[in-house]
Regions:
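A generic structural motif
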Residues: 30-36, 140-142
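A charged, well-structured terminal subsegment
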Residues: 133-153
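N-terminal beta1-alpha1 ligand-phosphate binding loop
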Residues: 2-33
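N-terminal beta-loop-helix "entrance" segment that forms/cooperates
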Residues: 39-57
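Residue-level recognition of beta-strand->loop/alpha-helix junctions
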Residues: 8, 39, 147-149
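Helix-loop-strand module that forms the ligand-binding subsite of alpha/beta enzymes
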Residues: 57-139
Length: 153
């Protein structure tokens, strides 16, 4: 059975994206589908620098669950037609080579779906999805092409 890795890039513990991610995680759990939810990506993950040798504990924990997951769902808010820096930073950390694994080994050929939630009409959400999809493809992820937008007024 599938194991699903869920990332929520919400900007606060109670953001709409985090609420949706938690709802989906609970739904999967009730259906007996193993899943691993990580949110608050802006906390405990320093910006990746060439001079930074220590891997954050949160990234080590994510790696452990990403290794055994075969699908990924990313919840991403949209700001100014793009996705947030803390999501890109987390993905960059996870893409690094480690312990004999090559660059993007954790991502290679895994299927990923993106769910976007915005306050308003979502006028620039499609472009943000396209930008994020391109970035995810760079990590060797297989991005579902369907665009999912949830608006909250």
């Amino acid at each position: 059975m599938s194991k699903i890795f869920i990332l929520s890039a919400g900007t606060s513990p109670d953001s709409y994206n985090n609420q949706l991610a938690k709802y989906l995680s609970n739904y999967f759990e009730n259906k007996g589908i193993e899943n691993f939810l990580f949110d608050n990506l802006y906390s405990d993950i320093p910006f990746l620098l060439d001079s930074y040798d220590d891997v954050p504990e949160k990234i080590s924990e994510m790696r452990k669950f990403l290794e055994i997951s075969d699908k990924i769902i990313i919840f991403s808010p949209v700001y100014n037609g793009g996705f947030l820096a803390h999501l890109k930073n987390t993905l960059d950390w996870l893409s690094l080579a480690y312990d004999g694994n090559s660059y993007s080994a954790l991502f290679k050929e895994k299927k990923v779906a993106v769910v976007t939630n915005v306050k308003g009409t979502g006028g620039n959400a499609q472009k943000a999805f396209e930008i994020l999809s391109l970035q995810l493809s760079n990590y060797k992820l297989l991005v579902f092409e369907k665009f999912h937008l949830i608006t909250k007024f």
